[in-house]
Amino acid sequence: MKENNKTIEAKNKELRDATKEFNEKLQKFLKDKVKKGFQIKNPNYKIDDNKISSNEVFKNNKNDFELNLPKNTWEEKTNKPESFENYKNVIPPYEDKFLPENFKEKFAPKNIKSEPLINKKDNLKEKNNNPVFDEVKIQEDDKFFDFSKFSETVSNQPENILKIEENDFKEIHDDFVSQYETFSKLETKENTNDLKTNLSSDTIKTIESKNEPEVQIESEIKDDSLEKEISEDDSFMDIFKAEQPDNQEDDSFVIDEEKAKEEYQEIKTNKSIVSDSHKIDIYEENEDLMKLNTLKSDKGIIYQIFGPVVDVKFARNQMPNINDCLEVKLPNNKKLVLEVALLEGDDVARCISMGSTEGLYRGLEVINTKNPIMAPVGSAVLGRMFNVVGEPIDNKPMPEKVEYSPIHKKPPSFDEQSTKTEIFETGIKVIDLLVPYVKGGKIGLFGGAGVGKTVLVQELIHNIATGHGGLSIFAGVGERTREGNDLYHEMIDGGVINQTALVFGQMNEPPGARMRVALTALTMAEHFRENNKQDVLLFIDNIFRFSQAGSEVSALLGRIPSAVGYQPTLAFEMGQLQERITSTKSGSITSVQAVYVPADDLTDPAPSTTFAHLDAKTVLDRKIASLGIYPAINPLESSSRMLDPSIVGIEHYKVARSVQTILQKFEELQDIIAILGIDELSEEDKLTVSRARKIRNFLSQPFFVAEKFSHKSGKYVSTQDTISGFSEIIEGKCDDIPEQYFLYVGGIDDVHKNYVAANSNNKVNSSNKPLNSENKSN
């Protein structure tokens, strides 16, 4: 009897071990099926809070293997089936406890009842949207299943939902039976019958409850069978066919090759769960994805925020394009504009913010405008001040009936560009003579604070408006807000504001705004050139800040820096801007760009890249400004490639070179004059110094925009009058006129008039002096 009890105890242990192994395989099998997208339609298996388990794994009779159902499932429905085949199509009720919050209300099919339907396929033929779980991820800390991806439209017919059928279960079942048979062969038939007799159903339930293993929730589940399924040797069609139930009776199951490819890539990508080193809050991610599923195709949600860089997640196949404009409605009813810079994986677009990201949070709705940033254009923008996205910043309402144009455009093609090289007359003597500007050219303006740069810019704006009927656009790129405010009010006082539009992206704004504000201003200028057929003057202050902002954006996007820390795409970005500044058959855009040279290093990549595009260089000198001569342009350091006899003419070229030669000789004599005095010079050098002083003074000019400061009327001098005036000085026709008569005049005629008037006054005064003395004596 004792031996018999030991035998039974040993057999019980063997049976428990076999049961335990069977349960492990069963649970692993079920988890893999759910992970691949199967819905468990067989109610024999239920999903608990932390594991998948089965009810009454086996019965006493090994040949009558089946899984028992919970009694309440079959109450008042049917008798307990005798075989697996009779209840394989039963649809169990939804398990609310493992679904995310509000999931059932939003996504559950409305025609599925809460109780099971038995063998009634005809009642489920109605079509409806039924999200099917594409993938199940397991979080180690939370111990629950989470559903991170849902298909958008899947038919509700049971034929289209893959189920765990008898043949899917057959492999595990056969393995268990073979182990049970091996166990049975250890004893005689009588002992086996005794074992069956002694093992009651209650005992089996007790064994199951004690030995059923807990599901190990790991951060990464490795399945050899799954690895085998997605190996490179297997084709995606074979894998997709393997997902079809072996005993599928309905012939409506059709293999879609494109869908098979997508599922193969998805299985291959998501075959392992996120590792511990890169945990994600899967539940929060699931909420974002659920929200995405309810949004329209042109909307996404904020996924990640770090500084001015914002990641936006979109629904699958709804990704925006590079440079697309995205809009975010902030809680304060304001609008934030993002520009798409990169397209990351997992349907994420990395964007650069055009404003402050304060107030943003994950899950906030984002609208894809499906267009680049749009800038206001047309006559409505004149006299107004805007930011990078075209919003007015002058405390005035948005202009009515304003047009919009994208800031990203291709430069004019070769056949659209003008082939003529035409000099752009500014009416400023020193520029037109020594540094002639070309229509559609780029001019670099070098000068520090307080040397008259703003006044020169205003005078150019005035002269192009009055002399050519042209317009001006001013782009403040990364400079001080104070300077922009001063410029705005000075333009109002100077009377040129109505011929100008101003666009500002100052240094306190994010790098995205500073990088794109020049394109916004250029877009406005292009509209006037093409639609109004006008000559436009585009001012960019400062072009160095444009390169600097691009460097910041490049670092934020994670690009590898190039020389001196600048972005590797510096030349490309500069070319995108500069190539659009040109002359076409309709009109021209002439750009004057202030250039800051860091540490006076002309080899710095930012200024050196700019120099390659410049046609002229205008240098403002503080020494000349200290002499009270304005505009304080240094005639020796400034240069232009337009100063060529084939372009400006032989006479213009000779006069300009003679002026530069005299000024250069005068510069060389400065040291001798400072040491020995001017009296020690030769007669020829004295004549050179005299003419140089007159030329230096004659390069000055009264400006229209400075009339209220200088109390002198502004002068616009044509190029021909400028050439003739300097020619007379060089030829010695004005040697008898003192140098003070050349200061702040227009043409050479004004010099003669002032001199004659002064002489006549002197004669009158000299003739009156003796008469007065005689009267006194008398």
Curated annotation (Swiss-Prot):
Transmembrane segments: none annotated. Its EC number is 7.1.2.2. Keywords: ATP synthesis, ATP-binding, Cell membrane, CF(1), Hydrogen ion transport, Ion transport, Membrane, Nucleotide-binding, Translocase, Transport. ATP binds at G447, G448, A449, G450, V451, G452, K453, T454. This is ATP synthase subunit beta. It is an enzyme of class 7 (translocase). Produces ATP from ADP in the presence of a proton gradient across the membrane. The catalytic sites are hosted primarily by the beta subunits. Pfam families: ATP-synt_ab, ATP-synt_ab_N, ATP-synt_VA_C. It is a peripheral membrane protein. Its main location: membrane. SMART domains: AAA. It catalyses: ATP + H2O + 4 H(+)(in) = ADP + phosphate + 5 H(+)(out). InterPro entries: AAA+_ATPase, ATP-synt_VA_C, ATP_synth_F1_bsu, ATPase_a/bsu_AS, ATPase_alpha/beta_chains, ATPase_F1/V1/A1_a/bsu_N, ATPase_F1/V1/A1_a/bsu_N_sf, ATPase_F1/V1/A1_a/bsu_nucl-bd. One of its GO terms (cellular component) is plasma membrane. Residues 1-289 are annotated as: Unknown. It comes from the Bacteria. Residues 290-778 are annotated as: ATP synthase subunit beta. Belongs to the ATPase alpha/beta chains family. CDD domains: ATP-synt_F1_beta_C, ATP-synt_F1_beta_N, F1-ATPase_beta_CD. GO terms for molecular function: ATP binding; ATP hydrolysis activity; proton-transporting ATP synthase activity, rotational mechanism. It comes from Malacoplasma penetrans (strain HF-2) (Mycoplasma penetrans).
